[in-house]
């Protein structure tokens, strides 16, 4: 069976992220990617996880407690992902974005292309060669299609000599299945 967007994002990250690496979860949400990344980098690595909603930080802490998983290698940051460079000075191996709204949260609080593109630019600037920035774009909500279009325009215009860009989507599914974009630094 083909991987769904979330499964594929995890596969793409697990191919490059190693114990001891520094990674970013740009949209913490319910904490599932943060937990996954924490396992990948292990105790010697670091996960910087961002969200503008305090509810996301609470749900992530709860998820870690429920899984009896330490937060020692994780920094939960109550800030927009366009503040990454304010908090992360290290070179990063991977970054993941789940764009849209917090599942189970306020559907009027959504990601926006301006802050997302700024955050992606920051991740790319700090990415090591071979590092990957993953964007899982949920676009079935108001404002979602506009964000997707602007992100596609941004990613399409990246220099092919510096980055390889992948688009992964299911083209025969209804209800706006998420589209995954992967940007890998080449040099």
Predicted regions: what is each one?
Residues 1-21, 35, 39, 57-93:
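S-adenosyl-L-methionine
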Residues 18, 41-42, 127-129:
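Helix-to-beta-strand junctions that scaffold the AdoMet/dcAdoMet cofactor pocket
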Residues 27, 126-137:
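Conserved beta-strand signature within the Rossmann-like core of class I S-adenosyl-L-methionine
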Residues 29-31:
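Conserved glycine-rich SAM-binding loop
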Residues 46-51:
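Conserved SAM-binding motif I beta-strand of class I
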Residues 97-119:
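Mobile active-site "lid"/loop adjacent to the S-adenosyl-L-methionine
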Residues 144-187:
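Class I S-adenosyl-L-methionine
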């Amino acid at each position: 069976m083909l991987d769904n967007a979330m499964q594929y994002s995890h596969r793409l990250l697990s191919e490059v992220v190693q114990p001891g690496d520094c990674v970013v979860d740009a949209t913490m949400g319910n904490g599932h990617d943060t937990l996954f990344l924490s396992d990948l980098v292990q105790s010697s690595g670091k996960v910087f996880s961002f969200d503008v909603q305090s509810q996301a930080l609470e749900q992530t802490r709860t998820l870690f407690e429920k899984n009896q998983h330490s937060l020692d290698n994780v920094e939960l940051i109550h800030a927009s992902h366009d503040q990454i460079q304010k908090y992360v000075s290290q070179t990063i191996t991977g970054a993941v974005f789940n764009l849209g709204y917090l599942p189970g949260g306020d559907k009027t609080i959504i990601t926006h292309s301006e802050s997302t593109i700024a955050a992606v630019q920051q991740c790319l600037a700090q990415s090591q060669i071979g590092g990957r920035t993953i964007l899982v774009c949920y676009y079935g909500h108001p404002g979602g299609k506009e964000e997707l279009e602007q992100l596609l325009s941004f990613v399409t215009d990246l220099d092919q000599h510096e980055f390889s860009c992948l688009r992964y989507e299911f083209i025969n599914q209804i209800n706006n299945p998420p589209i995954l974009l992967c940007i890998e630094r080449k040099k």
